[in-house]
Amino acid sequence: MQEQKFRILTINPGSTSTKIGVFENERAIVEKTIRHEGRCFGNIKR
């Protein structure tokens, strides 16, 4: 029986960086950190 493969996109926004990952099941395929100034998102209301 063939194992199912799942692709998962994760996005973790933070105050000084945003982390992005693509996983196939539990294995990371792509991981990237994008750094930005905290004030970029200062005007966003929660």
UniProtKB/Swiss-Prot annotation:
Q: Which reaction does it catalyse?
A: butanoate + ATP = butanoyl phosphate + ADP
Any idea of its EC number?
A: 2.7.2.7
Instruction: Give its localization.
Output: Cytoplasm
Any one annotated GO CC term = cytoplasm
Matching Gene3D superfamilies: 3.30.420.40
> In the record, what lineage is assigned to the organism producing the protein?
Bacteria, Bacillati, Bacillota, Bacilli, Bacillales
Q: What is this protein called?
A: Probable butyrate kinase
The record, for InterPro entries, names: Aliphatic_acid_kinase_CS (IPR023865), ATPase_NBD (IPR043129)
Protein keywords: ATP-binding, Cytoplasm, Kinase, Nucleotide-binding, Transferase
Listed transmembrane segments: none
Report the PROSITE patterns cross-referenced here: ACETATE_KINASE_1
For this protein, the record's SUPFAM superfamilies field holds: Actin-like ATPase domain
Please report which protein family the annotation says this sequence is part of: Belongs to the acetokinase family.
Q: Which GO molecular function terms does the record list? A: ATP binding; butyrate kinase activity
